[in-house]
Amino acid sequence: MTRINIDRLTEIEETQAILSLYYDARSYIEDFDWCVSTKKCWYDQGFGIYQKIGIFLFEIEPLNENVDDFIWVIVGDLPSVYLDKSILTGQEALEKYCELMQEWIDNVKNGASLDDCYPIPADPTIENAELLSSRIAFIRRELLMKDDE
């Protein structure tokens, strides 16, 4: 018999949650035609939330030289997004994520076109905009330490 160490179990559960987010992120980025495969991956632990949000930097094998070889991916309990290598840190990636989501939210609430917005795989309803808005407010307040803009 082995004694169960609850502290260690928590670490295992956290690792499993990060791995689950990683597999989601890898699957998301590898679904794009311009990503031949993923080579390496880094997880930004400072801005991730256990089972809710993961910020990853992937080194990929791009389809051609017109595609960045480093891509940020944000996944979790919110719409997935990829960002190019002009983003330098996980914090900057999360800030850009919030900007992209806020643009979609604002356009939905104002009845404006979504043609220039990052594509969000959700119906453009006020209800979905409100749900996303609450998540973005949480990210800004708790992770980025900023008030809602």
Predicted feature residues:
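Short aromatic-glycine-(Arg/Gly/Cys) micro-motifs in beta-strand/loop hairpins
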Residues: F47-Y82
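Short, charged/polar micro-motifs that form catalytic or ligand-binding hotspots
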Residues: E11-T15, S80-L88
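N-terminal "first-domain core" detector
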Residues: M1-G48
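An exposed acidic His-Trp-rich patch
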Residues: L83-D123
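Acidic, proline/glycine-rich low-complexity IDRs
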Residues: T2-R3, T15, D106-E149
